[in-house]
């Protein structure tokens, strides 16, 4: 039987047989997903993006100005928490691979089970305990818990793509819906959180004597009323986002049905985790996809994390950076349907090269200091970011299907593929942020100065222009050797449909 499973070279079939197989495969394929199901699936990914955006923009300033812990302690909380979040990705993938199929699926119980604890940990992350000694341990514990539980939600959610439908086009469409809502969630997280906590960061409680960093004692003094109010608005924002988690997981559970995929000829035979991890990391298309998008994701992360600093210290755009950030995110949201149409029309590899739009416009922003140019660059960056977000999650199911075809005897590796991809993405983002911050340290960045030195300005220009451009070029060069084309993708889809038909037929005969 194992030998039969590998005898699937479609080139040996006659044209009439191939047409017959296509008709039979199309009839055997699962019903297409409704728009409502795709929307419900997409909504399930929104809260993680909202909370991630809120914490990315405001957690550091909250720890320093509201929780009143030292910068060293804040860096400890952020770095260790993110590292722990990355470590939990393969752990969650391993646990999911060992999970049994239940009445509501294999992935849905994970999301339902972790959501209440995720909400509690997120809320307590934005709560200031009464004790001061050891307060850093409070935030380290709950930020680590939040990162781990967020992973326990995100890994099964992204893996769910493989169990929505056996039709690759439907999965791609669901991914486009998901990425649209997730980018919209990022926009909402940055905008809504900013509006709620804006009063916590006004300058009315500070008295700055000059622009050289010499501050009066009044600037260092934090009135009790201000601190109390600031802590309250942050808790209100955390409560709203926590309620959003509960609402979205309810929509996901009620609107999406997880479907098992009978692609394996030996039903229920699961490859052990470490063996499966070794096999996935030796799979050529997966390594190619990871290598290319690690560089591309790191490039996007470097540019995003240094954009506000660049606007403030290197481009004289400090009064416009918030609007520029919103422009980037809005452009990304609006362009995702375009990229979905483009990849269906011209192929995913061709669409991936749309990421290169970021290169000339970023260089233009560095060399031409103009508000109009900055907004043009923001729109172009939004287009590129949308492509970089959509394409890896659209291409990853194709890699998994290709692996299924060449390894039809085992099941349960989908979570390993997805968790490993998320792990390496987080790892690359962490390394990129560490290197960019370290480069600013070498350039003698001084937090007490309103006007930085020329070396800092030059470093920021390199971090916004040259460094991301080089990484994107290398990443796209690697992606050019990605072996899965549109033709091979369709051949794989047909071959898997044949396996599914045989599996269903053998099951009916046994029954």
Swiss-Prot record:
Membrane-topology annotation of the record: Multi-pass membrane protein
The keyword Cell membrane belongs to this UniProt entry's keyword annotation: yes
UniProt keyword annotation of Metal-binding present: no
Entry's transmembrane regions: 108-128, 136-156, 236-256, 280-300, 323-343, 357-377, 379-399, 415-435, 462-482
Chief place where the protein resides: membrane
GO cellular component annotations of the record: plasma membrane
Subcellular location: Cell membrane
A GO molecular function held by the record: sphingolipid transporter activity
Reactions performed catalytically: sphing-4-enine 1-phosphate(in) = sphing-4-enine 1-phosphate(out); sphinganine 1-phosphate(in) = sphinganine 1-phosphate(out); sphinga-4E,14Z-dienine-1-phosphate(in) = sphinga-4E,14Z-dienine-1-phosphate(out)
Keywords of the record: Cell membrane, Lipid transport, Membrane, Transmembrane, Transmembrane helix, Transport
GO biological process, alphabetically ordered: carbohydrate transport; lipid transport; positive regulation of platelet aggregation; sphingosine-1-phosphate receptor signaling pathway
Gene3D superfamilies: MFS general substrate transporter like domains
InterPro entries: MFS_2, MFS_trans_sf
Function text: Lipid transporter that specifically mediates export of sphingosine-1-phosphate in red blood cells and platelets. Sphingosine-1-phosphate is a signaling sphingolipid and its export from red blood cells into in the plasma is required for red blood cell morphology. Sphingosine-1-phosphate export from platelets is required for platelet aggregation and thrombus formation. In addition to export, also able to mediate S1P import.
Family according to the record: Belongs to the major facilitator superfamily.
Protein name: Sphingosine-1-phosphate transporter MFSD2B
Lineage: Eukaryota, Metazoa, Chordata, Craniata, Vertebrata
